[in-house]
Amino acid sequence: MSWQEKINAALDARRAADALRRRYPVAQGAGRWLVADDRQYLNFSSNDYLGLSHHPQIIRAWQQGAEQFGVGSGGSGHVSGYSVAHQALEEELAEWLGYSRALLFISGFAANQAVIAAMMAKEDRIVADRLSHASLLEAASLSPSQLRRFAHNDVTHLARLLASPCPGQQLVVTEGVFSMDGDSAPLAEIQQVTQQHNGWLMVDDAHGTGVIGEQGRGSCWLQKVKPELLVVTFGKGFGVSGAAVLCSSTVADYLLQFARHLIYSTSMPPAQAQALRASLAVIRRDEGDARREKLVSLIARFRAGVQDLPFTLADSCSAIQPLIVGDNSRALQLAEKLRQQGCWVTAIRPPTVPAGTARLRLTLTAAHEMQDIDRLLEVLHGNG
């Protein structure tokens, strides 16, 4: 089979399963409204949970940062790309979340891959929740260590896997809020079992940071858990992009020496770091509390209105509210019908989610209003 035949066969298989991913160019897509092909839609596919992507103070901070530092960092942080803006953001994140150090990464995917690649050796073992993000599972699969997966949020299964002999160290990996189901991990129980077996805990809290807990400190703070490795991302609650790893000083020093994604990547622009500092300030003050409270009320309104629909509603109290349809083609058809009626909703299909669980992944944000939720419910009931 030639290269072209191999590529064609893979694409044909995706098409046959109604699983071919497509991109849609949008003129505006992060806020309450999405604009595409000169039409405006209510946007229920954005991860901008607090509605900060268009916040005037954050936009102004980025503009002022670009005027001061330029539009790029100019290099790796180990060469010339680590600015006083990066340093200030790291210090503010560490203070906010109660860690000694924070290290910035260009994306959450890069942060997860970097930590696992740098930390794990052949004699070690990763024990990951089966529904962990692709970046975590791919990094674990590519690492020299053994990968074992425990049933989703099943602490008993986790304990059984940790109890089996391991010549090296064990790292337990999970998420705070799961990206496709929107449910939360029982972090306190997971940490207790992990500590009983002398392991370390790594939590990816991409969908909890900024959105839940006191001052938006996220899932771990809410559950009074402090994992050895905490990954936070800035493309969701912060409304920007990028990520950070929170850890001890010695682990930070270690990652600065051995995390290749840090050493060999251009740093995020300093202007972006300035925007993130402004976003963090909003998240921490009363305005952040008000946005989180509004989001909670929107979620409650939505969940109360979908109980009698013929779909499976995931057990989620987060901004991620999946309606599980099951069949790929049915999910695609339903998403298209909703778009035709002015609601931009995305159908998520295997391999992103398990076979037979194709869904509409609805996301609610503080930028929405109650009438937006009511319109979404009206359209869903009309097509249920």
UniProtKB/Swiss-Prot annotation:
GO terms for molecular function: 8-amino-7-oxononanoate synthase activity; pyridoxal phosphate binding. Pyridoxal 5'-phosphate binds at residues 108-109, 179, 207, 233. Its EC number is 2.3.1.47. Keywords: Biotin biosynthesis, Pyridoxal phosphate, Transferase. Substrate binds at residues 21, 133, 352. GO terms for biological process: biotin biosynthetic process. Its cofactor is pyridoxal 5'-phosphate. The modification N6-(pyridoxal phosphate)lysine is found at residue 236. Pathway: Cofactor biosynthesis; biotin biosynthesis. It comes from the Bacteria. NCBIfam families: bioF. Homodimer. Belongs to the class-II pyridoxal-phosphate-dependent aminotransferase family. BioF subfamily. Catalyzes the decarboxylative condensation of pimeloyl-[acyl-carrier protein] and L-alanine to produce 8-amino-7-oxononanoate (AON), [acyl-carrier protein], and carbon dioxide. This is 8-amino-7-oxononanoate synthase.
